[in-house]
A protein has these predicted regions:
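Surface segments flanking catalytic/ligand-binding clefts of nucleic-acid enzymes
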Residues: 23, 144-289
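Short gly/ser-rich loop at a beta-strand->alpha-helix junction or flexible surface loop bordering the NTP-binding
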Residues: 1-165, 277-289
């Protein structure tokens, strides 16, 4: 796999080890030399848009925001932005020269900006307010996972956010969970949350066998986000096959989804989960009668 594609799958940035789980050393070296991947610090790599955001913000006299700010803070995102996002003060006009950036307008307090980037809490709430639910949830999960923001802080900030976008911010804040391992799992959970009758919990322990990426304990449904990242070795593949078999022996129905389908065909994933909930509910009702 190409190194830039690997970073896209990882959420826009990753450690050297994470990248090399998906590609080769030669491919990573070549991508860095070509400028398609940048090295942020020792052992950490990102897509070039991460640095481009600061350059664009300085050129526009604005502030790095939304997904660009999330990447700046080291959080993984569902899908890295094609162009950096910059927020300008409401009175500020765009310069006549063309700048490669998505521009939005908002008045930011001094405390909400750190070194030209929206502060961590403002970044999470902005993403929750303005981005689609899966994208906002992935950022919030990542922020919680990193320890940079707490659940209580996020809920308080969402509750006190401006009326426009507040319902979306509250939805993300209430659903956010730092146990979600990566943006792939966050995006899958965002879809599952919208399925009637399905109530999932991330990284749910099943007996002594292991953890399911997502699980509905009441219905006995285990949902797995399948990625080459975690099947890079034969032993990892064997482990997961045995784990799924053990789940089934404990009366769990295992449903597995590919990254491509979760990211690009969410309506299909939603339809499958809806069918699985219906089938499992019917089966449980028959068995109980």
């Amino acid at each position: 796999m190409d190194a830039a594609e690997a970073l896209t799958r990882l959420g826009g940035l990753g450690t050297r080890g994470e990248v090399l789980d998906l590609t080769s050393r030669a491919a990573l070296r070549r991508a860095v030399l070509d400028g398609r991947v940048v090295r942020l610090k020792a052992g950490t790599y990102a897509l070039p848009e991460t640095n481009a955001a600061l350059v664009a913000a300085r050129a526009l006299g604005g502030t790095v925001s939304l997904l660009s700010a999330a990447l700046h803070w080291g959080w993984k995102v569902r899908m890295p932005p094609k162009r950096p996002t910059v927020t300008l003060a409401r009175h500020r006009r765009l310069p006549e020269r063309d700048i490669n950036a998505e521009v939005r307008w908002a008045d930011l307090a001094a405390a909400e900006v750190v070194d030209g980037v929206t502060c961590k809490l403002r970044t999470v709430v902005d993403c929750a307010r303005w981005l689609p639910f899966p994208d906002g949830l992935a950022v919030a999960d990542s922020a919680l996972r990193s320890g940079d923001v707490t659940k209580a802080q996020l809920l308080t900030a969402a509750e006190s956010s401006p009326r426009t976008g507040r319902p979306a911010a509250l939805k993300v804040a209430r659903a956010a969970d730092g146990r979600s391992a990566n943006p792939f799992e966050s995006a899958l959970r965002a879809i599952a949350i919208e399925v009637p009758g399905l109530h999932v919990e991330p990284q749910f322990p099943i007996g002594t066998v292991g953890h399911a990426d997502l699980a509905d304990e009441r219905l006995g449904i285990a949902i797995e986000a399948e990625s080459w990242e975690f099947h890079a070795t034969r032993e990892a593949f064997r482990y997961d096959v045995r784990r799924y078999t053990a789940f089934t022996r404990l009366d769990w129905l295992v449903v597995r989804f590919l990254w491509e389908d979760v990211m690009h065909r969410p309506e299909l994933v939603h339809a499958i989960l809806t069918d699985v909930v219906r089938l499992r509910s019917t089966w449980r009702a028959v068995r109980a009668s």
